[in-house]
Amino acid sequence: MIMKRLVSLFVLLAALTFESLACTSAIVAPQRSSEGVPLLWKHRDNARYTNTRIEYISDGRYAYTAVVPNTEKYDKGVYAGVNEKGLGVISTATKNLPEATPEEYKACTLSRMSGGVMWNALRKCATIDELEELLKKTKRSRRSHSNFGVGDASGAVAYFEVWDLGYRRYDVSTSGNNGFDVRSNFSHAGDPKKLGSSKRRYDLIMKEMAEHKGNFAPQNFIDYSRSYNSIKYGNVLDDDSYYYCSNHTVPRASTVGVFVVVCDGKCPRMLVMNGHSVSSIAVPVYVQAGSNIPECVHGDAMRLLSNDFREKAYTSVNKKKLLNKEVVRSVLRIKQPKMDMPKETPVDIHAFNANIDKLFAKHEKRVRKVLSKF
C-alpha cells in the first residue's frame, strides 16, 4: 500500500511539474553538419532548476565540459555535455513511455535519473556503443524517462528513448530524415495517444529543418532557439495581443539555456547560452581548455540577466500566459556580437575568453538599457 501511494505521488508530481521540464532537441549526422562531425542541440526549459553553470569536470575515466547545477555535486544533474573523446549527450523529458509497476519501482533508484545517466556516460564512455552498454547494465537500477541524443567522434549519432526497464535506439542513418532527427517531450516508442502539446514544437522544428538548404551550422540552432515561429500562428510576435500559447514556440518563459554540442574527437566543444535565448549570447567553450571557461557562463552574469528579462517579458493572469511582445521584439533587435567558434582550441584561451566576457558585458548593458524602459 505504501509503495502504491509512493508511485501515485510520483506520477502526480510528474504531471504537475512536467510543463516546467519540457525541452526541444535535434541531432545531426556528419554529412549534414558544417563541422563534419555530429551536432546535438538542446533548448532547455525548466522553471524549477534554473541555477546552472558551465563546468569542466575530471571525476572519472574521461574529463568533460558540461551544463551542471550550481552545486558541488554533479551525479544527479548533468543537463548536456561533451567529453575529451568527443562523446556528446543531451536529453529531453518524455511522458509517454512505459511506467514501472509498484513492484518494479522498488528496484529503481532516483540517483539514476536522466542527469545521472548523462553524468555516468560522459565520465565513463567514449562511444555510443559504450553508452548503450551502460543502459543495458542499469536496466533495473535507473529511474529515467528521457530521450537521450548521443553522438561520438566516429560520426555515429542516435536517439535513445529510455525508460525504467528498457530503451529503444534510433540511429539518424535509419531515420529517413535526410541526416537529422528531432525530439521534444514524447517518444516514438511510447503511447501514440499521449504525445502531448510538445508535438507542436516537434512538428515546427521538423518542418524548419526539412526546409533547410545545405548543412547545419551551430548558429542555425541558436536561431531556432530565438525564433517565435509556430506551426499554427506563424510568428507570434507579429500579433500585438499579449496572449500566446507558450507550447507553440521553442522559446518560452521556462527557457533557461541553449546548448549545441560538437562531437569532435580532435576538438570537442559546445556553443552555449546559460540563460534565456532572447537575452543571452552564444558562447563557445572547449574541453581541451580545461577550467578556462568564459566567466559569463561559468558564473552568474548571463543567468541573472535572463531572470530580469523573463520578469519583464512573461507573466500569467488568471492562468492565461501573457507575453510582452514589445519587450521581446526590442531585445531581439539588439545586434548579437560576432562570435566565432574556431574548430581548434584557441592558443591563447585566456585572451579568447576575456574577449567573450567583454562582448557579453557590452551586450548586457544594451539589454538592461532596453529593459529599463518597460
Give names to the regions the model predicted.
Residues 6-16:
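Sec-dependent N-terminal signal peptides
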Residues 17-22:
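Sec/Tat signal peptide C-region and signal peptidase I cleavage site
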Residues 130-150:
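Secretory/export targeting leaders with adjacent low-complexity proregions
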Residues 127-136, 239-245:
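Charged, amphipathic alpha-helical segments
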Residues 1-4:
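N-terminal secretory signal peptides that target proteins for export/translocation
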Residues 24-87, 91-123, 143-146, 152-374:
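C-terminal, well-structured catalytic/ligand-binding subdomain of enzymes
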